Amino acid sequence: MSRTALIENITAMLEDADFLVSDRCAVRPKSFDVAARRDEDLVLLKILGNVDALDAETGAEMRRLGEYLQATPMVIGIRTRDEELKPGVVYFRHGVPVINPDTGYDLFVEGMPPLIYAAPGGLYVSLDGDLLADEREERGWSLGRLATELGVSRRTVSKYEDGMNASIEVAIQLEDLFNEPFSSPVDVLDGAGEVRDADPTPSAPETDPDDEHVLHVLTNAGFTVHPTARAPFKAVSEDEGSSPARVLTGHSTFTPAAEKRARIMSSIGEVARTRSVYFTEENEDRESVDGTALVSCEELADISDPEGIRELIRDRAKAPSEA
């Protein structure tokens, strides 16, 4: 299956699951293919045949954007270089959760999150340690008795009851012994932080020198500006005094390629519940494109009042619907 067909299939699946899905980010640079929202769950999805194609820089950008937009970065893919991704298992690449399409269907359509995650050494599950302790005590078993049944040490059983994760083999043994599942679902839509072994969110990239003057003006106007490296927009700007607070921010000469980015920003903004603004090097005869505000750098330079800048963006940029 081609990557384009895979993206179309995943998009259709999400729409069937009542997600609002953005237009595909068919521009470069980019770190994700589509944004999708259902209620308060916002996902930034990268869709790949081979998930090993996700490099460290893209993974870092996805995690930063997830933090800026209050979204979950996620990869849906088919295989690694060595094997097919297993259904019902969460993998990780550069701190980003990775699942296959079958797992995605179970999660998004059926509402069944995966129970298993991959980590160095094999496949693991999160155990409900309190439930395990209750069941063991109700049966009148000591730590030693359960340790003998499992073929592990008393210390290991004690750690399981304190919340240590277990191999899938141990989880199956426990279920067979007690006729009770002890596995806790992996909260993929919250980033799987409880099982993800990753560094803190990577620091922001350096601002492109070509964009410094625009982002500097926004900073002086009271925005908190987060530069991006691999997105259809140059920054995510936050204005805590507005609703919505976040503004997808672009800047360049307004070429046909830039107009395409502006339209994609509008689509992403509708899903992510942000406004979007594109700062142009020349004056344009339009004030917006598909809801993305167009503001020339000359106009920006003529406004000395920070509130005037915020008002201009609010007036020209379409506010996203809450649907």
UniProtKB/Swiss-Prot annotation:
Portion annotated as DNA-binding: 143-162
Tree of life domain: Archaea
InterPro entries linked: Arc_TR_HTH (IPR020886), Cro/C1-type_HTH (IPR001387), Lambda_DNA-bd_dom_sf (IPR010982)
Domain HTH cro/C1-type: 132-189
Region (Disordered): 188-211
The keyword Transcription belongs to this UniProt entry's keyword annotation: yes
Keywords, sorted A to Z: DNA-binding, Transcription, Transcription regulation
GO MF annotation list: DNA binding; DNA-binding transcription factor activity
Record keyword Transcription present: yes
Name assigned to this protein: Putative HTH-type transcriptional regulatory protein Hlac_0273
Lineage: Archaea, Methanobacteriati, Methanobacteriota, Stenosarchaea group, Halobacteria
